[in-house]
Amino acid sequence: MPQEVIKKNHMDVAWHEYTDENGGNVPVVDSSIAEKASVIGRVGIMFLSCGTGAWRVRSSMNTLAEALGITCTADIGLMSIEYTCYDGENGFTQSLCLTNTGVNTLKLNRLEHFIRNFEKEGKHMSGEQLHTFLDNIEKTHGLYSPPALGLAAAIACCGFTFLLGGGPIEMFCAFVGAGIGNYLRCKLTKHHFTLFLCIVSSVSLACFAYAGLLKLGEILFGISVQHEAGYICAMLFIIPGFPFITSGIDLAKLDMRSGIERLTYALIVILVATMSAWIMALILHLKPVDFIKLSLSTEQWILFRLLASFCGVFGFSVMFNSPVRLAVAAAGIGAVANTLRLELVDLANIPPAAAAFIGALTAGLLASLLKNKVGYPRISVTVPSIVIMVPGLYLYRGFYNLGIMSLSVAASWFASAILIIAALPLGLIFARILTDKAFRYCT
């Protein structure tokens, strides 16, 4: 029986057909506006596919347009770009779309190098040569296999569990649950399954694995049922920290369309993930009770929080397809910034939202200092370093209490989460304003 072929909902763009006749020998700077615009648009949509915000996408398109002697205006969203190029006599307008969204910091870095070298090298290449070069960049897929990404999620959620107050038992169960859950998500994503299926399947499996391990420990070793408090930590790999934070940055630059679309996407993921976890909790009879308190001194808390924050940020960076060197840099910044945030809450009684702002500001300033040494785009370091500060547990507890109609408790959790989520991009934005002259002005 012949296998049914699924037709793509978004047709592929034949980029090489935009090159002029005999265009293989003519520098793109001397080619037609259609050929120039095809290069600009393709680079823009490739930047967008990496998960970066509208301001950075437009900046890269402007750099190419200036080098090619034309003007470009672009309207950028989460999944699409509509842009027009002018050369004084003619105009060329095009609409481009992605089939899915995600984060790929390695591809983003390669595109950044392409933009930096375009003035000296790129504009003297032909359109055909440029599209061939971009073909190679576009093939930049994941550095890591699904098992490796499962391990990264396991490490990240294990660290996350300790930072939220969990002990060794919760950390181990979350490690296994998150690893299995993210492995399944990666396999489903690789086969291009739809977003909702990937979220529901991976979250359900992660919660089921946590509950299964806990029940096994209860039977074999008499483990207390109160350790169920950490089951939600097993699904925190699904929290869309990158679009949450980039939406705030886009809104700060008045890129309203991109900011609102990114925020909507993040809220959709949160809604589906928390609803899936809530239903699993009802099936498995799990409740988001408080963690059993750990007896640690202040010095021990600081040391272990540094270590857990490092592991958490490192895991999330790997999940964003960051090379190990970049992941280590982000993890170092995240360890300092997140530990500072937590200690400000514990030792100085600063409200969590204010502490989140200070932590994000610190991460942004440290990333600016290390930007030239690391050699990677700033956003590849800053966003992963503060993703661990996104209050996924607060969001889940808010939804759980909403589901059981404890409306006042739900409102309290949601309010706390919203304040922290608002504070995180604000911290990065002010760090960028202080350290980046181009970002400081409305141009």
PLM feature spans:
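Generic multipass alpha-helical transmembrane bundles of integral membrane proteins
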Residues: F237-F242, Y265-N349
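Core alpha-helical transmembrane segments of integral membrane proteins
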Residues: L143-T246, M319-F320, V324, A329
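Hydrophobic, membrane-facing alpha-helical anchors
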Residues: F118-T132, P147-C157, F175-R185, A281-P288, ...
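Structural signature of hydrophobic alpha-helical transmembrane segments
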Residues: L163-G177, Q226-P240, I292-A308, A348-T362, ...
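Membrane-interface helix termini and inter-helical loops of multi-pass transporters
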Residues: G217-Q226, L284-E299, N401-S412
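Soluble N-terminal domains of membrane-associated systems
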Residues: M1-T132, N136-E138, G142
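Alpha-helical membrane-inserting segments
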Residues: G159-L164, I180-T189, L205, A209-G217, ...
